[in-house]
C-alpha cells in the first residue's frame, strides 16, 4: 500500500445531517416551500453533488418549472446559500471527525505514507471541514486533492479517483480507498482501487458488493470497533491493519 485515499462527506466526518440542515435553511431563506426530511434526503443522496441533487428534486416535484430558463441561476444561488449555512455549522463545532480519522492522518504523516482526497463535495465545503479540524495548512498533509471542481462527472463514475491516481503517479492497486457509500465504493472500484467502507446511517442500506471490508468505523483506543477484525492487532484500524487488508486483496487477485 503506497497511498491512502479518503472520501470526505460521511467518511472523514458524519456530515450529512449538517448538509441536510443547511439545505433546509437555504430553502427557508429564499422562500422555497421545500423541506427535506431524513428519509427523503437518504434517497436524494443517491444523486452525487449538491446542485445535481437540487435539480433532481426540482424535476421530481415540478418537472415543468424545472425546465424554466432561470433554473440554473436559482440552483446556483440556493446552493451558494446552503454552502454558507454548512460552513457556519462546521465552524461552530459539534461536527467531529469519525473515529480513527485523525489518528490515521497522523500515523500516515509520521510514516511518510502519501494521503489523498477524492470527493464530489465543493472546495468550500472541503475547506470548512478540514480547516476546522486540521488547521489552515491542512492541504499540506495531502499529496493529491480532487474535489467537485476537478472533474465534470461525479461518483459513481470513477473520474475523481482516476484524477487522484494521475496526480499521485500510482497504479490503482498500489492504493487503498476509504469510502462510506455505495456510490463512492462503485467509483473507487471502477477505478480499480481496493476499498474499505465505513457506512453512516444515511448509507447503511446501500449495496457494498465488492468492498474489501465493511466496518462500522475505523476505531480508536477510546472508541474501539465493536468486535475484532481479522488482520488487525487491535479493535481499531491502524496502518499495519490497512496494509494487511490491502495485501490480502492483492494476494487474492494474483
UniProtKB/Swiss-Prot annotation:
It holds the Pfam family Hydrolase. GO terms for molecular function: hydrolase activity. This is Protein CbbY, plasmid. Keywords: Plasmid. Gene3D superfamilies: HAD superfamily/HAD-like (3.40.50.1000), Putative phosphatase, domain 2 (1.10.150.240). The keyword Nuclease does not apply. InterPro entries: CbbY-like, HAD-like_sf, HAD-SF_hydro_IA, HAD_sf, PGP-like_dom2. CDD domains: HAD_CbbY-like. It comes from the Bacteria. Belongs to the HAD-like hydrolase superfamily. CbbY/CbbZ/Gph/YieH family. The keyword Lipid metabolism does not apply.
Amino acid at each position: 500500500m503506497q497511498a491512502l485515499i479518503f472520501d470526505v462527506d460521511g467518511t472523514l466526518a458524519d456530515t450529512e445531517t449538517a448538509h441536510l440542515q443547511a439545505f433546509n435553511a437555504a430553502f427557508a431563506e429564499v422562500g422555497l416551500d421545500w423541506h427535506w426530511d431524513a428519509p427523503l434526503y437518504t434517497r436524494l443522496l443517491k444523486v452525487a453533488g449538491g446542485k445535481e441533487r437540487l435539480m433532481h428534486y426540482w424535476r421530481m416535484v415540478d418537472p415543468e418549472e424545472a425546465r424554466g430558463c432561470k433554473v440554473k441561476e436559482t440552483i446556483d444561488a440556493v446552493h451558494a446559500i446552503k454552502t454558507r449555512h454548512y460552513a457556519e455549522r462546521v465552524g461552530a463545532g459539534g461536527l467531529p471527525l469519525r473515529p480513527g480519522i485523525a489518528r490515521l492522518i497522523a500515523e500516515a504523516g509520521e510514516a511518510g505514507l502519501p494521503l489523498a482526497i477524492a470527493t464530489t463535495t465543493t472546495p468550500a465545503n472541503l475547506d470548512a471541514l478540514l480547516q476546522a479540524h486540521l488547521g489552515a495548512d491542512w492541504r499540506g498533509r495531502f499529496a493529491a486533492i480532487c474535489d467537485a471542481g476537478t472533474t465534470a462527472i461525479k461518483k459513481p463514475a470513477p473520474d475523481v479517483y482516476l484524477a487522484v491516481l494521475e496526480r499521485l503517479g500510482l497504479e490503482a492497486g498500489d492504493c487503498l480507498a476509504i469510502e462510506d457509500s455505495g456510490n463512492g465504493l462503485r467509483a473507487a472500484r471502477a477505478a480499480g482501487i481496493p476499498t474499505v467502507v465505513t457506512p453512516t446511517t444515511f448509507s447503511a442500506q446501500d449495496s457494498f458488493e465488492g468492498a474489501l471490508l465493511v466496518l462500522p468505523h475505523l476505531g480508536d483506543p477510546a472508541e474501539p470497533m465493536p468486535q475484532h477484525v481479522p488482520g488487525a492487532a487491535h479493535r481499531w484500524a491502524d496502518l499495519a491493519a490497512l496494509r494487511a487488508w490491502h495485501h490480502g486483496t492483492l494476494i487474492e487477485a494474483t
